Amino acid sequence: MKQIYVHGLGQTSDSWTKTIDILQTTDYSLCPNLPDLVHSKEVTYDNLYAAFSDYCNQYDEPIDLCGLSLGGVLALNYAIQYPKKVRSLVLIATQYKMPKKLLKFQNLLFRFMPKSMFQQMGFRKADFLLLCETMMELDFNNSLHKIS
């Protein structure tokens, strides 16, 4: 059984290191780095989710998913699409319906931030902006019943 911890936007897989150390689950804990999953593809939500799904689907046994913010959205989407492949689901600060006004405001703030602020976060500034834009229409409200 694998435990997959998924970081949020503006974070890296290292964000989970202390948590995993405290839980002492390093033998079966995985922390994919989201920017690495999309490689050279355009950073849209659909591309990121497809890459995340491929990552999770490489494991035959049901997985435990724990996601923070963007990581939670990806984990939720995966649990809806593959409910039999998810043994447990922990969502932290995760929206099942994207707050459009908040995302638009966030993108506005991102536009004024220098590119250098984004370098340590894994994605380029343009990637942040595009990813947030492509998430605005996400709404899992009608699919939540698929998770038991």
Describe the function of each predicted region.
Residues 17-21, 28-64:
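Active-site loop/oxyanion-hole signature of alpha/beta-hydrolase fold enzymes
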Residues 5-8, 31:
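Structural cue for short, hydrophobic secondary-structure segments
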Residues 8-11, 69:
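Active-site glycine-rich loops that stabilize anionic/oxyanionic intermediates
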Residues 10-18:
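Serine-hydrolase catalytic-loop signature spanning alpha/beta hydrolases and amidase-signature enzymes
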Residues 65-67, 92:
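Short beta-strand immediately N-terminal to the catalytic nucleophile in serine-hydrolase-like folds
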Residues 133-148:
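Conserved serine/cysteine hydrolase catalytic core
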Residues 45, 80-81, 86-116:
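Flexible "cap/lid" loop of the alpha/beta hydrolase fold
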Residues 67-71, 75:
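Gly/Ala-rich beta-loop-alpha elbow adjacent to hydrolase catalytic centers
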